[in-house]
Amino acid sequence: MEKFLDEWSLRILRELYKNSKISYKKLSKKVGISVTSCYYKVRDLEKQGIIKAYTIEIDAKKLGFPVKTLIEVKTRTGVSTEVVKVLGKYPNIFKIYGITGDKDVVIEAYFRNIEELDLFLKRIREICLDIKDTETHIVLNEHRNPKGWF
């Protein structure tokens, strides 16, 4: 049975989602509980595996990778570890998702330009014979719920 979180824990998660570097003192003020309670709630969230990591968000455009793509891949055998293994070798790929529907995999990847994207698509089709078809979407803009999805 799933354990539902109390309102304080949800508030903590929302604040950490906005800024994972926030101090316990500032976090406790924003959430409205003592620093000690805040510390223990965060520790409990970590122990439960709800908080898996504290990370950063990188601006790919400022790194010289302005072309963000979502590439749908249809394979001959469904989601195979071989396809994921081959695709995982490319540094342009940020995430690989196994999905339901007409396609088997969605790749989130970043490129310097359209030519680099085109070369990538040609290479993966040559190297990974299990890839039957791809459909590429270039992300024009991105919108995020500032409160988080939870």
Where in the sequence are the language-model features?
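A compositional/biophysical signature of low hydrophobicity enriched in polar/charged and small residues
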Residues: 1-150
